[in-house]
Amino acid sequence: MRQYLDLLEHVIETGTDRGDRTGTGTRSVFGYQMRFDLSQGFPVLTTKKLHLRSIIHELLWFLKGDTNIAYLKEHGVRIWDEWADENGDLGPVYGYQWRSWPTPDGGHIDQIATLVEGLKTNPNSRRHIVSAWNPALVDDMALPPCHCLFQFYVADGKLSCQLYQRSGDIFLGVPFNIASYALLTMMVAQVTGLEAGDFVHTLGDAHIYRNHFEQAQLQLTRTPKPLPRMEINPAVKDLFSFRFEDFELTGYEADSHIKAPVAV
């Protein structure tokens, strides 16, 4: 994926060195956008191997409205371990906001169900938006949402998605986010009878941690390979009925994994 390598290079060459919450230090730019045509292949990195199992299970976990890491641990996914409390809870993070956004009268809004229904009944609406950023509950979250708002758009029978990500850990997090939202777009397209269009990824604070510089430089020496295809079980017509077994990535060839520490 040339778009991703261009982002890495842009931040390394033009970014500003800054301090950060974790004390690690970053080099960052503010405001960057990438676009991926999903008809041209599934946008997963080929210049380092990604753990696709983690990406799929995390997305299914979000869609379940779950905020405890028990499901993830059961399926060998450890990406949230550092932030969970002793009971495995994370507070009202993504799944809660997506599926149970609290209202002042004590009710809840299922933003995802509302989104799907809106795409079916009023595809031309400009209100197909889901937000995970709830200012009233941010302090109760183990980690406030980095990928905090997304919008869907329908044109010529194709469904496109734009994500706004306030904070992007380019080396470790952003590759996961690209694949996750590309997959979500494909899933929503299938259950609404549309074709997958573009995934547009807009980043606010796009940063490389100081202890990822060497790894980023190594990745820039590698040449992108052709993108694989994501095959989704066509029998699934309900977004909340997808299971891990309904997805198969074919033709995925990637360079070896590059290890890097997580800044907590």
UniProtKB/Swiss-Prot annotation:
**Sequence positions that bind (6R)-5,10-methylene-5,6,7,8-tetrahydrofolate:** H51, D169, A263
Q: State the GO CC annotations.
A: cytosol
Q: EC no.?
A: 2.1.1.45
Annotated Gene Ontology MF terms? thymidylate synthase activity
Read off the InterPro entries from this record: Thymidate_synth/dCMP_Mease, Thymidate_synth/dCMP_Mease_dom, Thymidate_synth/dCMP_Mease_sf, Thymidylate_synthase, Thymidylate_synthase_AS
Q: Which residues bind dUMP per the record?
A: R21, R126, R127, R166, S167, G168, D169, N177, H207, I208, Y209
Q: What is its main location?
A: cytoplasm
Q: What are the UniProt keywords, alphabetically? A: Cytoplasm, Methyltransferase, Nucleotide biosynthesis, Transferase
What sort of enzyme, by top EC class, is this?
Answer: transferase
The GO biological-process annotations, alphabetized, read as: dTMP biosynthetic process; dTTP biosynthetic process; methylation
* Gene3D superfamilies given in the database record: Thymidylate synthase/dCMP hydroxymethylase domain (3.30.572.10)
Q: Where in the cell is it found?
A: Cytoplasm
Q: What does UniProt list as catalytic?
A: C146 (nucleophile)
| Record's catalysed reaction(s) | dUMP + (6R)-5,10-methylene-5,6,7,8-tetrahydrofolate = 7,8-dihydrofolate + dTMP
UniProt pathway? Pyrimidine metabolism; dTTP biosynthesis
Q: What does this protein do?
A: Catalyzes the reductive methylation of 2'-deoxyuridine-5'-monophosphate (dUMP) to 2'-deoxythymidine-5'-monophosphate (dTMP) while utilizing 5,10-methylenetetrahydrofolate (mTHF) as the methyl donor and reductant in the reaction, yielding dihydrofolate (DHF) as a by-product. This enzymatic reaction provides an intracellular de novo source of dTMP, an essential precursor for DNA biosynthesis.
> Which family does this protein fall into?
Belongs to the thymidylate synthase family. Bacterial-type ThyA subfamily.
- What does the annotation say about its assembly with partners? Homodimer.
This protein's name: Thymidylate synthase
Q: Which organism is it from?
A: Sinorhizobium medicae (strain WSM419) (Ensifer medicae)
